[in-house]
């Protein structure tokens, strides 16, 4: 009889100690800061882990840390809940990222046993992280297999463009390998999308849910890759009108129901634009003439090299330029 009493008591003590340790760690985080602590088994101490922030069409590096005794950490001030991305350029890592949410005063713990980022466990008291984890869990088996293939592809790209840069024969061999890998990754991605879209039918409409719908809506133009257009439209119908009026909601609407393409003789869309001399111009000034509108992306390396104005424009106007 005593055996059956002692075991529950021991379990209760262990749980209390675990909760106490977590509370102690959180208590050490000031109200205006966040703390990420990671512990990775089976990885060498030379590996560099990067923390990035998604700023529209570019990932900006926030901090780096080198693995020491299997551990890494990031700490900084933060005023609002936001999503960060963890990546590594080291060999064997997939060319993708792990979504990690941070918030004021929050402690975030990451644990992993390999280089396959999406398989790492992220634990915190942040609601958005809990929802992010539920999305990942939808198709964990497929995620793990996909990470393995992406790691192989990323290693081939590194060999092609760094280790064997300029070697056309090796590049030809590399692209053949990558093409064969992508034949495996495309159906895996589609399986993951299908499972996540299925989950979204019943999931709460959260910030994570909106981010996912925006991602899938943006992919609808690639019909051969993204075969779930009707599912995306159905999920859009779930969105409250208040969400549809937000910036993200309007962007989703434009992807799902794109504006009509202008034809010859149609009225031009006009607006205030500035030329290289910082003079105010209007497209209507060129009525009756052919106009070439060249759209540049500040997040593209070749664009930044070709157009040096792109970088200061983005730096000086971070909110206006995505």
What are these regions (language model features)?
Residues 279-304, 310:
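Short active-site neighborhood of thiol/selenol oxidoreductases, capturing the structured segment around
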Residues 180-184, 220-229:
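Short coil/turn connectors between adjacent alpha-helices in alpha-solenoid helical repeat scaffolds
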Residues 22-187, 191-194:
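A non-transmembrane, solvent-exposed segment enriched in polar/low-complexity residues
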Residues 305-322:
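Conserved helix-turn-beta segment immediately C-terminal to the redox Cys motif
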Residues 227-274, 284-286, 315:
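N-proximal helix/coil linker or "cap" segments that precede and/or mark the start of modular domains
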Residues 1-8:
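Bacterial N-terminal signal peptides that target proteins for export
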Residues 17-20:
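C-terminal motif of bacterial Sec signal peptides marking the signal peptidase cleavage site
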Residues 204-220, 250:
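Amphipathic alpha-helical repeat scaffolds of TPR domains
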């Amino acid at each position: 009889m005593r055996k059956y009493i002692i075991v529950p008591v021991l379990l209760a003590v262990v749980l209390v100690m675990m909760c106490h340790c977590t509370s102690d760690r959180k208590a050490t985080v000031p109200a205006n800061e966040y703390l990420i602590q990671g512990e990775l088994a089976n990885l060498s101490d030379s590996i560099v882990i990067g923390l990035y922030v998604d700023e529209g069409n570019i990932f900006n590096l926030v901090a780096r840390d080198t693995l020491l005794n299997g551990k890494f950490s990031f700490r900084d001030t933060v005023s609002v809940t936001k999503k960060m991305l963890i990546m590594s350029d080291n060999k064997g890592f997939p060319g993708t990222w792990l979504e990690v949410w941070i918030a004021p005063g929050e402690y975030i713990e990451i644990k992993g046993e390999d280089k396959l980022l999406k398989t790492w466990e992220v634990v915190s008291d942040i609601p958005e992280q809990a929802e992010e984890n539920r999305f990942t869990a939808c198709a964990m088996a497929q995620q793990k297999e996909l990470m393995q293939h992406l790691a192989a592809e990323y290693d081939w790209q590194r060999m092609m463009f760094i280790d064997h840069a300029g070697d056309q024969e090796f590049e030809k061999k590399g692209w053949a390998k990558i093409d064969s890998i992508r034949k495996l990754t495309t159906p895996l991605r589609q399986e993951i999308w299908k499972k996540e879209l299925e989950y979204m039918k019943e999931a709460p409409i959260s910030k994570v849910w909106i981010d996912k719908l925006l991602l899938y809506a943006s992919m609808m133009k690639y019909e051969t890759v993204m075969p779930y257009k009707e599912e995306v439209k159905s999920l859009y119908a779930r969105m409250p009108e208040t969400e549809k009026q937000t910036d993200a909601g309007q962007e989703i609407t434009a992807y799902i129901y794109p504006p009509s393409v202008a034809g010859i003789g149609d009225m031009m869309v006009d607006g205030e634009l500035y030329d290289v001399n910082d003079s105010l111009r209007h497209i209507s000034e060129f009525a009756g003439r052919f106009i070439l509108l060249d759209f540049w992306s500040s997040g593209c390396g070749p664009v930044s090299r070709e157009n040096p104005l792109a970088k200061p424009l983005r730096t000086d106007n971070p909110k206006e330029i995505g």
